[in-house]
A protein has these predicted regions:
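Bacterial N-terminal signal peptides
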Residues: 7-16
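N-terminal targeting or regulatory segments adjacent to alpha/beta-hydrolase or S9 domains
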Residues: 21-193
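Short beta-strand element of the alpha/beta-hydrolase
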Residues: 210-212, 220-231
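Primarily recognizes the serine-hydrolase "nucleophile elbow" in alpha/beta-hydrolase
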Residues: 236-238, 304-364
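Cap/lid segment of the alpha/beta-hydrolase catalytic domain
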Residues: 236-301, 355-364
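A catalytic-pocket lid/entrance helix-loop region that shapes and gates access to the active site
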Residues: 272-277, 331, 349-380, 427
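The feature captures the conserved acid-bearing segment of alpha/beta-hydrolase catalytic domains
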Residues: 360-419
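C-terminal catalytic histidine-bearing segment of alpha/beta-hydrolase fold enzymes
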Residues: 410-451
């Protein structure tokens, strides 16, 4: 009898897991009373409305929404309401230019964060794909968004007085290193495209490494695209088997490691990059105290050399050169555009490290994780690079999240403000660094000289 009861209990438990909870397909939707959430004046009331969408029936007192308001003013407010009472209206204001952040998520009666369960069938090919995507997502039922006051007036701390002189010296140092390249051609699945991997000599401890795909039609010249990857403490670049037929496409890794090596090589490589226990670029106690030891300095050398190498290919049309990337890739995109005037278009998404002076000096709402503020880091701040972009270059910040506090909206606003060229920024309400709401949500764009 005991075995039967145990078996039945197990079956019920398995069914409960498969059945999931009433909020497994729900989203916590948030919006402001203004369609453009950055149009508030100092002291003007901001009204956020939060609602549950896609929820199944649940009881009073079963779930609650816990919310927190923070902002560039340093103020903090908190609250908790029964989820059955939604929609929830949160009213706040900001007396100065900057941003307010509103975070909210669902908890149960014991205060535990609600975590979604996968509701599909993992035994089908489509279900397996959906499960893999589900595992990479934030499983909370949450909203993380914000609103801004006069972001067009925001600025960072003053840039270093010798900013241009500093970079002129760096470029001169790079010029002394001959641009010798080791190139290997790889099998391409498309005979109209050739695939090359390369290692190019560079200033600093390591070369530039990556790959480039080039259309094989020798009768034409092509526009060029260079892309950069985001931060990853163990990112491994792989070589593609083809590429576009209408453009050259180069993709470099940030570090200059060898391509196609065994896993142990990359594990040892990334371990060796650590400084005082921090992964690359994050050690503010020593490495980032000086431009001579800052890891970003070596990355910038590699970007400048990669741009030179890309432009040396006879297949390039000599005029169309686009740089693109997200997060740390967005940071690298702005370095490329700020340090190479041949860049004709830049497409940074959620660009990292904007307004590095906003953390300590200006006391803005900044993340705990990331690059700390030092004077040396101001030479690498993309808000300063933005001022040097070619006035004819078209820059589109393809996504800026009002709830992204890995790359806070205040810093991205300053980047946009400092661009003196055709520019566009796409704001997304409820978007964090790695999340864009699946439901219909507020989004809007700002442009200047954009056609």
């Amino acid at each position: 009898m005991n075995k039967v009861v145990l078996s039945a209990s197990f079956s019920l438990l398995a069914f409960a897991v498969l059945a999931g909870g009433p909020l497994d397909n729900a989203v916590l939707h948030g919006e402001t009373d203004k369609a453009r959430a950055i149009d508030y004046a100092p002291g003007e009331e901001m009204v956020f409305t939060l609602s549950l969408q896609g929820a199944e029936a649940f009881a009073d007192g079963q779930y609650f929404v816990k919310w927190t308001r923070t902002g560039d003013d340093g103020a903090k407010e908190e609250g908790k309401v029964d989820a059955k009472s939604l929609p929830l209206v949160v009213k706040t204001k900001l007396e100065q230019p900057g941003f307010v952040r509103l975070e909210a998520f669902v908890i149960d009666a014991k205060g535990k964060t609600y975590t979604k369960s996968f509701t599909g069938n993992p035994n089908t090919p489509e279900g397996k794909k959906a499960l893999n995507a589900f595992e990479r997502k934030d499983k909370r039922v949450f909203f993380d968004g914000g609103a801004g006051v006069q972001p067009e007036t925001l600025q960072s701390v003053p840039e270093p007085k010798d900013f241009d002189e500093f970079w002129a010296k760096r470029k001169a140092r790079l010029a002394k290193v001959p641009m010798t390249a080791t190139v290997k051609e790889h099998r391409s699945s498309n005979p109209s495209v050739k695939v090359l991997s390369f290692s190019v000599a560079c200033a600093g401890p390591r070369p530039v490494t990556g790959w480039v795909t080039i259309p094989t039609d020798a009768k034409r010249k092509y526009p060029a695209l260079i892309t950069f990857h985001g931060y990853g403490a163990h990112f491994i670049q792989t070589i593609p088997d083809s590429g576009p037929t209408d453009k050259m496409h180069m993709f470099i890794n940030a570090h200059g490691y060898e391509l196609g090596r065994e896993d142990e090589y990359y594990t040892e490589f990334y371990d060796a990059l650590k400084s005082n226990g921090r992964t690359f670029g994050l050690d503010s106690s020593w490495q980032n105290k000086s431009t001579d030891t800052a890891y970003f300095g070596w990355m910038c050398y590699r970007i400048m050399r990669a741009m030179q190498y890309l432009k040396s290919f006879p297949e390039w049309d000599g005029k169309n050169l686009t740089a693109a990337g997200g997060s740390m890739g967005g940071l690298q995109t702005m370095w490329a555009a700020g340090l190479d005037l041949d860049v004709s278009a830049a497409q940074p998404s959620i660009p990292w490290c904007c307004d590095m002076g906003g953390r300590e000096t200006l006391k803005r709402n900044q993340p705990n994780w990331g690059v700390g503020e030092t004077e040396a880091m101001r030479y690498f701040d993309p808000v300063n690079m933005a001022k040097r972009v070619n006035p004819k270059c078209r820059v589109e910040i393809t996504r800026a999240g009002l709830g992204d506090y890995c790359c806070p909206p205040s810093g991205i606003s300053i980047l946009y403000n400092n661009l003196k060229c055709p520019k566009k920024i796409n704001w997304v309400q409820g978007s964090t660094h790695g999340y864009v709401p699946s439901e219909e949500h507020q989004k809007f764009s700002l442009t200047s000289d954009w056609e």
